[in-house]
Amino acid sequence: YKYMLGLRNRQPQLRVSGMSYRINTEEAQALAAKLRRSAVTVLNNYFDVLPLAPVEGDIAVLSIGEKEADAPFVEAMKKNAGIVHFHLPWNADEALWQEVQGQLAAFRRVVISITGSAYVSDRDVAFLEGLNLRAPLVYTFFTSYRTLQPLMPALAKSSAVVLAHSAETDLQQYVADVLFAKKPASGRMSMSIGKLFPAGTGCMIEPGMKPGKTVPEDYGMKSYVLQSIDAVARKGLEAGAYPGCRVLVWKDGLPVYDKGFGTHSDKDTTTVRSSDL
């Protein structure tokens, strides 16, 4: 075949000079930016905590990593809402962690921005896992998926996780707009990240979406705890313990959790509705 393809003849050498200019055209850069935006993945969004409501003074952004590494994201967040910004380096001492945690206690929503790190210390994991605030926690990762793996104990207690895969300026600005449903996100994971995020995981964010009406943290409860009810209810369905059920959790006279599962009976295919008792 090498004779048929002409490979026996000496091929002209590739011209290396000026190659970067021939490759990095405006069209190529626009395509790369489009692909980056398409890959943004919302891994979970319990009780529709996203999109955030742009209420002045309600939102804190905690940046963890090298200082200014997520400056485009922080600036874009400031344009969307009156946020208050905090910063911590990786492996910060305990006194600094505790000081920041005390300051975060005053906010209704907390966004934790993670920028690249080759090493996540046990101290970082312990702090984030033990971060006990009244606000739901929204994580944004401007890193590869690998950074999520050591932080799984903390992410299991989050309300939303957004994976951007990288940290280009335009991408950071885009993710900030996704958090307020000004831009869409429809990415899906092609592979599993631990047991928490199986392959295919991804939540849709569409422009114009409204924030969830009831977020458990606003009533002194935890979204990740109530969300686990879903798995318990579905496990009972799979085991044949019941054909269907409705789970209602009230707090301060309001339904914080209200979901139906399955059907009325084994012979009745009517799905359980909000009006069923």
Label every PLM stretch briefly:
Residues 1-218, 222:
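Preference for extracellular/luminal or secreted protein segments
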Residues 219-277:
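Short, conserved catalytic-motif segment at the N-terminal edge
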